[in-house]
Amino acid sequence: MFSGSIVALVTPLDTDGEVDYNSLKSLVDYHIKAGTNGIVAVGTTGESATLSVEEHVKLVMKTLEFADGRIPVIAGTGANATHEAVTFSKLFHDSGVAGCLSVTPYYNKPTQEGLFQHYKAISEATDIPQILYNVPGRTAVDLLPETVARLAELDNIVALKDATGDLERVAITRELCGENFIQLSGDDATALDFVKLGGHGVISVTSNIAAKDMATMFALAAQGKFEEAEIINQRLMPLHNDLFVEANPIPVKWAAHRLGMITHSDIRLPLTELSLSAQPTVEQALKSAGLLK
């Protein structure tokens, strides 16, 4: 259902801080042409935390419109209030989204039982396939494999995006949840190793600007051609790392603008544009990846 290179899409903004839908359409077309396996609209990289509900819904619906059935679209629907996460998921009922990506509740630090009940409530409210999203570095809570296993027993909880970077969890989760439960890396730097160990793909920041390379790399991995995939991975490794020289999505939006993929690199406060001191680092990573001369 979900595999390969799925992009965690940036949300392009104009200089007034409004969504730039012309650039969004160009990005969707770029990913279709590059062979990207799916698009996550309005996730962390899409600045979900600083979008209004109206903007959030419109962004997902416009992404679906621009995709026009040519590529699966996954809606970011996470919230730290369960009723809000349920509402978001229900808003996309019959919309055509392939799934919902729901981050663990952040800031309020629920227990493992609280996390289970949170996702159970979402699961019971909608038939849309749900992807759990564990990123403790941002949320201050860790969705443990044992809790994932409980959730995997629910009908429409089908996948996990694991952004811990802990490769030992792949085998643990596979053992607890079975091989049919989809595991997606949320960490570009370790994603290929994640797949080697039994994962199914990646929800990627790097793919925003190196979509064809990422799609090719994970297609090779799916064929067991890991040596060929690793050649691409090593070339992209500076990008994997340096796109986090400042908080995501600051560097990747700057890089997308530098490559002419979006009209502006604007980002909403409290995030600010990439600092002058960090720009040479990202520029060099683009050159190392072969994206700039």
Swiss-Prot record:
One GO BP:
diaminopimelate biosynthetic process
Pathway this chain belongs to: Amino-acid biosynthesis; L-lysine biosynthesis via DAP pathway; (S)-tetrahydrodipicolinate from L-aspartate: step 3/4
Active-site residue numbers: 133 (proton donor/acceptor), 161 (schiff-base intermediate with substrate)
Q: Give any Pfam family that matches.
A: DHDPS
Task: List residue numbers at the site (Part of a proton relay during catalysis).
Answer: 44, 107
Give Gene Ontology CC terms: cytosol
Q: What is its EC number?
A: 4.3.3.7
Q: Where in the cell is it found?
A: Cytoplasm
The answer to whether UniProt assigns keyword Amino-acid biosynthesis to this entry is: yes
Give residues annotated as binding pyruvate: 45, 203
> Taking the first listed entry, what is the main subcellular location of this protein, grouped into a coarse class?
cytoplasm
Q: Indicate whether Oxidoreductase appears among the record's keywords.
A: no
Known catalytic reactions:
L-aspartate 4-semialdehyde + pyruvate = (2S,4S)-4-hydroxy-2,3,4,5-tetrahydrodipicolinate + H2O + H(+)
Question: What are the disulphide bonds in this sequence?
Answer: none
Q: Which keywords, in A-to-Z order, does the entry hold?
A: Amino-acid biosynthesis, Cytoplasm, Diaminopimelate biosynthesis, Lyase, Lysine biosynthesis, Schiff base
> Which GO MF terms are attached to this record?
4-hydroxy-tetrahydrodipicolinate synthase activity
The entry's family comment says: Belongs to the DapA family.
Q: Subunit structure of this entry? A: Homotetramer; dimer of dimers.
Task: Name the NCBIfam families on file.
Answer: dapA (TIGR00674)
* Role noted for this protein: Catalyzes the condensation of (S)-aspartate-beta-semialdehyde [(S)-ASA] and pyruvate to 4-hydroxy-tetrahydrodipicolinate (HTPA).
Question: What name goes with this protein?
Answer: 4-hydroxy-tetrahydrodipicolinate synthase
